[in-house]
Amino acid sequence: MTRRPGQAGSAAGRAGLIAISASVALTFAVAVAGPSVMEPVLPGRSGQPPWALDAHLSPYLAVALTAGSLAAGTLGLVLVVRAMRSGWSVPARAIVVAGLLAAAALTLVPPFGSSDQLSYAAYGRMLVTGHNPYITTPAQLAALGDPVARAVQDWFTTPSVYGPLATAIQGLASLVGGTSARLTVFVLGLVNLAAFGAIALLLHRMMRGDQTRQLRAALLWTANPLLLMLVVAGAHVDGQAAFFGVAAVAVMFGPWGGRRPSVPAWPRCAAAGVLVGLGFAVKVSDVLVGLGLAIALAIWLRPAWRRLVPLLAALGAGFAAAAGAALAIGGSAMLRQLSRESDMVSIGSPWRAIRAVIHLVVTGTAATDIVKSGATALAVVLAVLLIRGLPGVLPGRDRDPGGGAGPGIAGAGYPAAGASVVFALVLAWLFAWPYVLPWYDALAWALLPLVPLAPAAGTGVVEGICWLLLARTAALGFGYLPARQTDAALPPGLSWLQPVLRHGVTPVILAGTTVMLVVLMVRSRPRRRSATPKDAAAWDSSTMKPQAPGRTPRGPVGPQRCPGAEDTPPEASEAPARGAGR
């Protein structure tokens, strides 16, 4: 009997969900087992959350379970994404609920993978005890006898590198936790859970009216087993920064679904700017979201420059208000810390080997300066290629080797194009920058569901990007097993992990995915399409709203809409003493 394609897709989809479930179960097992080579000790009173056993996992078992979770999660994502391309589907709401329940369960058990959460607790403790987190180190606070600071392992001699909003959240958690590092970490975990869940619900709302896109968003973010491990179970602040980035896109380009949206008015631009500024006050990398929003406006409003200027001014004013307040609070000490961090080159980055070669010719900090310049140039090149190559970004152009129009362009129009520009800048930075850690990819994963996929026929550009991002995140996850150094000595039988994976395999895979991204975007060959009543609707440049068919535009013809189609889918080398991950 010949098997119908839908049957094969259903089998792959079911297998993918089983693999994802197994990955989450293994992640939970490592966390609930208690302190191990993967999980630092959380000092605190007995019975305080987060709760765990004291199973004393051997280093071999802890690493094996974590590696198994990464492998199962990666396989599960591959299967479900491919199954969706074959027409497989399940209720998106069920996946959202399952993902949120998994995230909640992982919040109730201790974080693992790195010891960054202990540094967060110490920075909050500094704030509530009257110390400046940007000039005070956990070691200095520990010398005063503070029990929370004494619990810090990695980054023991490093002041905070996070924005004032992140520090304020850490301070509030410290007020609740008091002298208990354990309870403080738990409160921070609740904040991270809220940010993760808010992104999940935002994406689901933004994709309303399209079950396929809602399912894709749920699988790529809410039920993504790699993010559940690296961001939620890892308790990293990157989820908070990602929330403000997604919220800015949602506000700027709304309403999503329902009636056809117009180009945003200045209040939306100002509100989006404020959200970007708040994200900047968590992690400075969120400034890329604001830059992407500005570029998106410039691309689509070139024929109406009189409208463009006030919108850009509103966006900039909103950002300046929030980011300016953050800089005023953080002061020059925060800027110095950010400057020092920008000089770091992760061992897992291919730039580490490049810098070593440059060191043979130059001395001092010149090699690092050359690497930073090269990374900046690469990021610009990647951003340009991505903006030119993603579907629906440039008005009147398609992008897909299969020759079709990108789906969701007609269904989402300007919002999809704007989100694609923001995604392009974030992805370019991630693939180009010398300082890389697995959880940094969270912002790209959060924005990816907003980018329309290419048609089912042929290999879509966005689908190819999805595979490259998955390969990159998985490689970093394996490379940082564990992302700890202090109090996490590996036994002789596991001593090969860092020199083989982190120093060797991970940089090679990251370099390979970057090269493949360049090739993919160069081969996308953007081509201009002519507008016809059947496949496009002209935009009136005076109002920047869709024209009714047959109506003569009052100004130059702007962006055109295409027919809808299927919407499927460190350790730092420069880290101060005891630094392993950030």
Spell out what each predicted region is.
Residues 2-3, 11-66, 299-301, 311-315, ...:
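Transmembrane helical bundles and short interhelical boundary loops of multi-pass, membrane-embedded
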Residues 19-38, 68-115, 131, 317-329, ...:
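Transmembrane signal-anchor helices characteristic of membrane glycosylation enzymes that use polyprenol
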Residues 23, 72-82, 183-210, 242-243, ...:
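Transmembrane-helix motifs of polytopic, lipid-linked glycan transferases
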Residues 88-189:
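Intramembrane catalytic core of multi-pass membrane enzymes that act on lipidic substrates
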Residues 90-94, 203-224, 399-405:
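Transmembrane-helix signature of polytopic, membrane-embedded enzymes
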Residues 190-194, 210, 218-251, 266, ...:
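Multi-pass, polyprenyl lipid-linked donor-dependent membrane glycosyltransferases
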Residues 198-202, 241-260, 385, 426:
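Specific aromatic-rich, kink-prone transmembrane helix
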Residues 228-231, 265-294, 424-431:
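Membrane-interface alpha helices of multi-pass inner-membrane proteins
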